[in-house]
UniProtKB/Swiss-Prot annotation:
Transmembrane segments: none annotated. It holds the Pfam family UPF0102. It comes from the Bacteria. InterPro entries: Restrct_endonuc-II-like, tRNA_endonuc-like_dom_sf, UPF0102_YraN-like. GO terms for molecular function: nucleic acid binding. This is UPF0102 protein RHOS4_03930. Belongs to the UPF0102 family.
Length: 117
């Protein structure tokens, strides 16, 4: 997949995942939020809890899951910490890390609380 095609496929996947969160009463507060440490695809809220969402797209859900590396998780943790610093409760804000897997047919599988800091 070329860089441009990959970029638009990723955007489409993120949009589909954002719709799922919005429809389930967990509004997306930020898209592609960028901090010094890295980028977070989507940030949603469920009451007072902040949900950091990493979206992975590939031919299958298993292939998408395999694309999430430890190094990438570390960057997400760093960016999440930066985001939480701006919250009223700071690092004490309830939060979780979800992973949304999107396959070639556009089917979405969400793994809530997929990894922890």
């Amino acid at each position: 997949m070329s860089g441009e095609v990959s970029y638009y496929a990723g955007q489409t996947a993120e949009e589909a995942v954002a719709r799922i969160y919005d429809r389930s009463g967990r509004p997306v507060a930020a898209r592609r939020w960028r901090g010094v440490s890295g980028e977070i695809d989507l940030i949603a809220r469920e009451g007072a809890e902040v949900i950091f969402i990493e979206v992975k797209k590939s031919t299958s859900h298993a292939a998408a899951a395999a694309r999430l590396s430890r190094r990438q998780m570390d960057r997400i943790y760093g960016a999440a910490s930066e985001f939480l610093a701006g919250e009223p409760r700071g690092q004490l804000t309830a939060s979780r890390f979800d992973v949304a897997l999107v396959d070639a047919l556009g089917r979405v599988e969400i793994i809530e609380n997929a990894f922890a800091a």
